[in-house]
A protein has these predicted regions:
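Short loop-to-alpha-helix "cap/lid" segments that border enzyme active sites
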Residues: 3, 14-108, 112-132
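Active-site beta->alpha loop and helix N-cap motifs at the rims of alpha/beta catalytic domains
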Residues: 1-8
């Protein structure tokens, strides 16, 4: 990290956030949400850290195309969260009408087949967010 000038570190594993404080960079820490996940607000309170919540499934840590139960967002500081997991043009307004995340992350929700982004789906997704 001393050789590149990064603004943000995005962590996807089981690493401890505090181990990365020495780099003095903002952090986005991915948390994988399962049907049994519970988040306590104090667990999401780290200086210069945002959290990306993504759906965990039996076989995948993200990329499943499935939404997690957004009700878990009711008791956490959503404005610090990046929301991922099953987002697509058909449900993005439903999310935004209930919660105000810092950012949304879309991947498979704008694909017409696995690994192939669809320009029309991408435009539809972005247009809906902008219009909202």
């Amino acid at each position: 990290l001393s050789k590149v000038d990064l603004d943000v570190l995005q962590l996807h594993g089981t690493e401890d956030i505090t181990d990365y404080r020495i780099f003095k960079k903002d952090i986005i820490k991915t948390l994988h949400v399962s049907k049994d996940s519970v988040f306590i607000s104090k667990n999401l309170d780290f200086e210069n850290t945002d959290f990306l919540l993504d759906t965990s499934s039996e076989n995948l840590q993200g990329g499943s195309g499935q939404c997690f139960d957004w009700k878990i967002l009711n008791d956490v500081p959503v404005e610090k969260l990046f929301i991922a997991g099953g987002l697509k043009p058909d449900n993005i307004i439903d999310l935004l009408s209930k919660y105000t995340p810092k950012c949304v992350d879309v991947s498979s929700g704008i694909e017409n087949k696995i690994g192939h982004k669809d320009h029309n789906l991408m435009s539809d997704f972005v247009d809906k967010i902008r219009a909202y």
